[in-house]
Amino acid sequence: MAKATTIKEALSRWEEKTGQKPSDAKEIKLYAQIPPIEKMDASLSTLGNCEKLSLSTNCIEKIANLNGLKNLRILSLGRNNIKNLNGLEAVGETLEELWISYNFIEKLKGIHVMKKLKILYMSNNLVKDWAEFLKLAELPCLEDLVFVGNPLEEKHSAEGNWIDEATKRVPKLKKLDGTPVIKEDEEEES
């Protein structure tokens, strides 16, 4: 099998293609590398100005080496092999959007560090119980959640009570699975 692409190699390809220096860039796209990236290695720490980093559609198993990304606001890790959220604490103070659909995440341990997270797209993962889902209520800014395709959502959607049950547990949500959340008791604001 072909050797995995390293972050360093992916960054130098990106630099060739865009003509920008990775250390200066605000947005860096390293998605769908051939062969895929398997590790978030220490080369990421050079991306001090990066606000949006895309590493989707690779074979990454662990979130790591984000400590140098002091300005990171959007992290895209969809379609990888990520099993947990460890490693996010390094960007807990800045990250506003986490796109992590199509992975193998079962537990949401570690999500509570995301003090500014507004948007969480984590469809098609493996979360199956309310105890895990409840950890999302600890996120003070979360307002847009996509959770479709997790066993928990599939079970309750089949029973017809997903939106009610989910919004009861995470009452701050404004949007769930792409649909605006309408609260019955809210008065029309004029």
UniProtKB/Swiss-Prot annotation:
GO cellular component: microtubule; outer dynein arm
Cellular compartments annotated: Cytoplasm, Cytoskeleton, Cilium axoneme
GO molecular function per UniProt: alpha-tubulin binding; dynein heavy chain binding
Pfam families linked to this entry: LRR_4
UniProt cross-references to InterPro entries, sorted A to Z: Leu-rich_rpt (IPR001611), Leu-rich_rpt_4 (IPR025875), LRR_dom_sf (IPR032675)
Protein name stated in the entry: Dynein axonemal light chain 1
Protein's gene: Dnal1
Tissue occurrence: Expressed in the respiratory epithelium of the upper airways and the ependymal cells lining the brain ventricles.
Family stated for the protein in its record: Belongs to the dynein light chain LC1-type family.
Domain LRRCT: 150-190
Note: Outer (ODAs) and inner (IDAs) dynein arms contain the molecular motors that generate the force to move cilia by ATP-dependent reactions. There are two mechanosensory systems that monitor and respond to the mechanical state (curvature) of the axoneme. One system involves the central pair microtubule complex and radial spokes and the second system involves the outer dynein arms.
Residues modified to N-acetylalanine: 2
Record keywords, A-Z: Acetylation, Cell projection, Cytoplasm, Cytoskeleton, Dynein, Leucine-rich repeat, Microtubule, Motor protein, Phosphoprotein, Repeat
